[in-house]
């Protein structure tokens, strides 16, 4: 598949990741450790009965959304290939640099071409393909408020096969941030010899439920990125998945974190039903 640019990417997200708060180079020690952990996790996940039927297929098509450099997608493909399954992997994200890195690295690891498409994850239905698995790996849900998440789920469910599976790698941020730790108005994000990155509370959007955070590098204070995040709990995420999938399960990895599984898309609410913005969002917050 050719590399395609589909409009709708969030420029702020690209600017946020450009601050290098979270390492994305798949060759880095951090990413390699994540990759090994993902391979181990997906290896155990194959014991789930929903994947037993999948393992009997001759070919499995995987779509990774919010893929970055494709750590999760490549790990899942590797696990399936080691079990004798022929795999096609497509990475999607709005960050083209990371996709290019991930495509090259993933092709080396798997010994076959890994394709990518630069696009907004809420529009993956426009790919016009059907996949067996849709994967969202790496705690990406805070980039989507509830209004966006509804569209994301609708779009993903339309590009999955009738027996398709959604895998979301998630944690309960309401529990971990607001109960265990406490919401921080000022939070050191990454401090090392090259940068001193802080995030600061910058507001709250009541209509979307999002917290505004300003990200600032004290060593380069001329550029500040202000973005909005939604701190999801697991319960509401799983309930939303249930609206779009016939069954939902949770594969717990540790307390308050694990893999949300959606099985067999319902396709009762179509992405076309959600194209018009509701009136409540048309006015200023």
Name every feature range the model reports, one short phrase each.
Residues 70-74:
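Glycine-rich SAM-binding Motif I of class I
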Residues 168-238:
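SAM-dependent methyltransferase
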